[in-house]
Amino acid sequence: KELIGFGMQEAALLGDILSRQREFVTDIRLFRGKRRKMTVNGVPAKNSAALSDVLHTVFFAPEDLFLIRAGAAERRRFMDLSLCQLRPRYAEALSQYNRLYEHKTRILRDSEDKPELLDLLPEFNEGLCRSGAVLIGYRARFCAALAEYARQAHYECSGERD
């Protein structure tokens, strides 16, 4: 729908595509409030899967680049939200890590008035290390799984070339 111009009711995407050493003529019609119509060499295509055999494309919208531009903190937040939904143990470890981090921060802040609080730091550091190790393990496996999906998607989009 984003491809239809402002104030317009429809848009057309026409293309001559050379794929698998054959030429294909595609015609895609987009309508506001109606289903799109697609043909490949004049034959109606039932769905976009019919086009994917002929045309390997990736469509990027500005919001797709958000994770790249937003920085590491936003990428970690995305990963945390994803992993919390997928792995309850990750959610527990993240919650524990955040709790320990907050306590340690309070100890450091209050230690000026109560220096004896600094004796508690080794215990909090150990807990942070344990929870952090669990988080790092889950994140590493998550990144490896995403990398495999990305590799496969790149392979398919590039016409099965590396």
Regions found by a protein language model. Give the residues of each.
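An accessory alpha-helical subdomain
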Residues: F66-G159
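Short, hydrophobic-rich beta-strand element in sensory/regulatory alpha-beta domains
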Residues: D162
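Nucleotide-state sensing region of NTPase/ATPase domains
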Residues: E2-I68, A72-E74, D80-L86, Y90, ...
